């Protein structure tokens, strides 16, 4: 089939300018390999994995695909340097970050031939990581799921494109060929999608949860600060409504309880959790209350996206959920998006007088 050659496809060595984001509890080997084999860039989510689990996930992904893929890493995690060493040792093609990695980590990855692609939410952040040597950035507008900002993609994307000279990947509100064509027209090098890939055959999210997503409309997401203290776009559920109307003390008690569960699940020491909290506070403007509340995120997402408990869990989602009504394979999804984008780009060319 025809394809689209962009700065992203040239940089990473993938066939199509389509990225599957590193969603916690969702982006595992099966989904990442499915995306890679379909010609896109799949990214493993390591924030909800122990170091040993990440090792296994990389090995498993390599048995399922020989195509390039990436790993998303928490730059403020205490073991981030060890995880970066693992990526280098395993020749992982892309390292992505939700928070800007330190300049020396970027340099180390680049020296080893790993492509560095942080996610950013403002033009000033894009300029900073570009000056530090980042190869590209992913910029997510407010329509996107999970942690998100207040500015729509249609405004945030051009502001970032005007600020940096490295490839920019657009995220937030993308799901079809029209979106890809529009992003390329803005000057982006491709699109990144989370919710759209969550709703595919290769996604390991329980079918009952997928159908919960498919039943939702454009008005069925909300941006809540009660999940972890930061703006978090999620599906409207009874739990989220309850959290929104609960007092701060109740949220802190729940967060402390979930921190204990996360510690038990990962085998982390309390000293490591505290060290990560200190790093998080140093790298952001979060209060200690927000940092304690951040313990909510892994366990609440796990309850919904892994255990299928939509009553006790949180379901991160972009607004695009209201436009989705199918569960395609990654290949059918990417092939369809690219073919439609090419058709629409060709149609635009016909408008010239």
Curated annotation (Swiss-Prot):
Gene3D superfamilies: Aldolase class I. Keywords: Cholesterol metabolism, Flavoprotein, FMN, Lipid metabolism, NAD, Nucleotide-binding, Oxidoreductase, Steroid metabolism, Sterol metabolism. InterPro entries: Aldolase_TIM, NMO. It catalyses: (3aS,4S,5R,7aS)-5-hydroxy-7a-methyl-1-oxo-octahydro-1H-indene-4-carboxyl-CoA + NAD(+) = (5R,7aS)-5-hydroxy-7a-methyl-1-oxo-2,3,5,6,7,7a-hexahydro-1H-indene-carboxyl-CoA + NADH + H(+). Pathway: Steroid metabolism; cholesterol degradation. Disruption phenotype: Deletion mutant does not grow on cholesterol or HIP, but grows as the wild-type on pyruvate. In the presence of cholesterol, disruption mutant accumulates 5OH-HIC-CoA. It comes from the Bacteria. It is an enzyme of class 1 (oxidoreductase). Its EC number is 1.3.1.-. GO terms for molecular function: nitronate monooxygenase activity; nucleotide binding. One of its GO terms (biological process) is cholesterol catabolic process. FMN binds at residues 22-24, 171-173, 194-195. Transmembrane segments: none annotated. Involved in the final steps of cholesterol and steroid degradation. Probably catalyzes the introduction of a double bound into the C ring of 5OH-HIC-CoA, leading to the formation of (5R,7aS)-5-hydroxy-7a-methyl-1-oxo-3,5,6,7-tetrahydro-2H-indene-4-carboxyl-CoA. PANTHER family: 2-NITROPROPANE DIOXYGENASE, 2-NITROPROPANE DIOXYGENASE-LIKE PROTEIN. Belongs to the nitronate monooxygenase family. This is (3aS,4S,5R,7aS)-5-hydroxy-7a-methyl-1-oxo-octahydro-1H-indene-4-carboxyl-CoA dehydrogenase. It comes from Rhodococcus jostii (strain RHA1). The gene is ipdC.
């Amino acid at each position: 089939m025809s394809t689209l050659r962009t700065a992203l496809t040239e940089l990473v060595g993938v066939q199509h300018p389509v990225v599957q984001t590193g969603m916690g509890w969702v982006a595992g080997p099966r989904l990442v390999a499915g995306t890679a084999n379909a010609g896109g860039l799949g990214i493993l989510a390591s924030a909800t994995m122990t170091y040993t689990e990440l090792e296994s996930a990389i090995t498993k992904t390599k048995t399922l695909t020989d195509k390039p893929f990436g790993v998303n890493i928490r730059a403020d995690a205490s073991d981030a340097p060890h995880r970066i060493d693992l990526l280098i040792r395993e020749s992982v093609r892309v390292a992505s970050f939700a928070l800007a990695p330190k300049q020396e980590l970027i340099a180390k990855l680049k020296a080893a031939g790993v492509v560095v692609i942080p996610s950013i939410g403002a033009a000033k952040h894009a300029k900073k990581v570009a000056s530090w040597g980042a190869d590209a950035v992913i910029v997510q507008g407010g329509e996107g799921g999970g942690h998100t900002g207040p500015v729509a993609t249609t405004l945030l994307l051009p502001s970032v494109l005007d600020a940096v000279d490295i490839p920019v990947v657009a995220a937030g509100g993308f799901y079809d060929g029209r979106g890809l064509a529009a992003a390329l027209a803005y000057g982006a090098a491709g699109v990144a999608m989370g919710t759209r890939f969550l709703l595919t055959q290769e996604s390991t999210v329980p079918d009952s949860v997928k159908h919960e997503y498919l039943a939702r409309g454009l008005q069925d997401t909300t941006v809540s600060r009660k999940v972890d203290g930061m703006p978090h776009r999620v599906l409207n559920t009874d739990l989220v409504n309850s959290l929104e109307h609960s007092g701060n003390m109740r949220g802190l008690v729940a967060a402390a309880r979930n921190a204990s569960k996360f510690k038990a699940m990962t085998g982390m020491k309390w000293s490591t959790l505290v060290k990560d909290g200190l790093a998080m506070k140093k790298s952001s403007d979060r209060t200690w209350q927000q940092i304690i509340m951040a313990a909510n995120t892994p366990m609440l997402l796990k309850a919904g996206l892994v255990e299928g408990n939509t009553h006790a869990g949180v379901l991160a989602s972009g607004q695009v959920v209201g436009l989705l009504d199918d569960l395609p394979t990654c290949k059918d999804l990417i092939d369809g998006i690219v073919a439609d984008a090419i058709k629409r780009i060709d149609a635009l060319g016909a408008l010239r007088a």
